[in-house]
Amino acid sequence: MFFLFYTKITHLVNLYYLFYVKDCWHSGNFVIFASRTSKRNIMKVGDRMPEVLGLNEKGEEVTMAQFKGRKVIVYAYPKDNTSGCTAEACSLKEHYADLQAAGYDVVGVSKDSAASHQKFIEKYDLPFPLIADTEKALLQSLDAWGEKTMCGKKVMGTLRTTFLVDENGVVEKIFSPKEIKTKIHAEQILEAIK
């Protein structure tokens, strides 16, 4: 038997949670199983990028104010040193001068630690900062954290997403996970900003 009830949890991001409660009898004991699913915020074109992006690989706070007068590419990726994420980062590195010439700075974000980011940057000589969003606050506010399928199983994780943000901090374009081709992602961006 399933019972469905809603509970509003108010904290920093005012997320809503939906709890499913199932009763079952096991050895004469009542057991409750609960799973939490957040009601996702949907970041869309025309929305403002959060002012504080988080801490970079050096532990320094990164804010949108630091990019005033410049456009920013904020790209969310699942994990340092994995094949797709490395291909995407290297694509952005290889075309970094072209992106800069077009008026864009680049910032990556994943749930990896600052130490992991530092090693990733050093290993591939990445010229842009990476946000260590270990608490997933930025990823959730960007709607870049959610359920996805990996190896046939449903898991929670980072949804590879890229945001093109104008000089005023407003999202101009969003590349969804299905649109991103990691090996040529910088070329996709350059084509979109022509």
Question: Can you describe what each PLM-predicted range is?
Answer:
Residues H26-S27, E147:
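Intrinsic disorder/low-complexity segments enriched in polar/charged and small flexible residues
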Residues I32-K194:
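Chalcogenol-based redox active-site neighborhoods
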Residues F5, V13-F19, P50, K93, ...:
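Compositionally biased amphipathic helical and low-complexity segments enriched in hydrophobic
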Residues W25-H26, T86:
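Secreted/luminal cysteine- and crosslink-motif detector
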